[in-house]
Amino acid sequence: MNEDKNFDKRNALNAELASLMSGLSANTSPIGDWKVIKVYEARMLGKEDPYDMEQLSAQRQAARDRIIEIQNELKKLG
């Protein structure tokens, strides 16, 4: 029974991990790399940032922090 719980927990964690990782890179994600690139392009052209970079950076860091937490949990589960 305990193995079933660990299996279910691993599956849930892996699903969350995949979602978070995809969110950082997907071109449809509200925290995706594409937004960082758009801010960079605007700055290179001397234009105003199209997005709030502080908020975007904080959201992206929160996702990365959660990714690390999940990876550590998965290591503990074996």
List PLM regions with ranges.
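A preference for well-ordered globular domain cores
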Residues: 1-78
